[in-house]
């Protein structure tokens, strides 16, 4: 996604939560023990091994800004978040059964006249027993009013009677909170983010979107406004990936970020970069989470051949929080780790390559061009023009980027490499240019010519190839492009002839 915003409202009772353990104001107790989650299917290739997906990558705005600009204007507390919490990702197989009844619920399976024909009843409400056929409503107002009522299958008035004994009678609330809950017992009503009532009450953006994900009434046929007030044109459906089956399998890799004030530093929490805006009021952090190194594994999952879902949830938050994301993406690469041993022969012990030895990523002019006193900015290599995107009305330069390799504990005489398969005919090419930047990891000391970079190209990786090796100078922030080579291909052929 290009950009998104998520409100972690740890006090608010969310959709289809009938836990009666509420405060007198109708809020959830013990917010740190609660969680809020969103799930979506992986809509493109689910074989992460084939596509070589290596990272979950995104930019996040600092959620712990001081002062007025950092207040979470949720309409209840309107305070800054000062305590932090956990942001957790699940990749793999995640249950689609939102209502936990092993029945495939979809709104357009409900009776168009609100009768009980083809309906089953359980602790969650009314659910269809029909076979799922199409993802469209019947196109008339009466049917829409009787089907667009959420996954509980109940209209607001019927929710009160249905959950009276197991939920409402157990509540001890103020009159205001009681009235609010009785108006929408399942907390699933949709509210569009524009409206005269919102304008009159001067509602801020978080309050405007607070009920935008509601499932009841989010697909009206008509509207009394001069804009479309739909949340979605399609019926709600538990089948997220639309494969006509309801999966309740839970087997996934889990990745945890512990977000706390004072811990948002490069090198911690998978933070690899940060940008401070020109006004100095906000900081954006770039996260790059290596998916091959999960924090935990749940269930029976052993590879990345079928990654069908991603689930994101917040927990351990004592206070409401807003997380603002930009460029949330799964990052793959044409380059793959070279797993064969490159250790120089001799009497030394041969080490085994591990995932922690090397990380593959990219740096780009649009995301990594701001440096600091201790960090070099990324710049376009000299003589390399940025491509122009001619497919848009306004011509723009594309994002120029380069391969980045990060090494840990690279021992003397050892080498690590990446490779990609290609089919180049170099007969009409004259030269090979390489531009290389080298810098030590934080806290490490690295001297000029202590490491080298090498390029191999040929018909295979072990016996039939040309190799160019370049000892590296450590790049200083004020002196860029200190390493590079510009070699004529004809010279490589001459050197090869002399060698043999």
Placement of each model-derived feature along the sequence:
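Extended, low-complexity, turn-rich repeat/linker tracts enriched in Gly/Pro/Ser/Thr and Asp/Glu
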Residues: 62-69, 77-83, 320, 426, ...
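Single conserved hydrophobic/aromatic residue that forms the stacking wall/gate
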Residues: 1-7, 11, 492-500
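Extracellular beta-strand ligand-recognition surfaces/modules
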Residues: 53-57, 84-94, 121-123, 133-136, ...
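Extracellular/lumenal carbohydrate-interaction signature centered on repeated Trp-anchored short motifs
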Residues: 45-54, 276-281, 303, 421-432
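Short carbohydrate-recognition loop motifs
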Residues: 5-34, 389-413
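Exposed low-complexity, polar/acidic, P/S/T/G-rich flexible segments that act as propeptides
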Residues: 316-377, 386-388, 395
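Extended intrinsically disordered, low-complexity coil regions enriched in Ser, Thr, Gly, Ala
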Residues: 318-343, 440-480
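Low-complexity, serine/threonine/proline-enriched polar segments
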Residues: 107-257, 360-371, 375-376, 475-492, ...
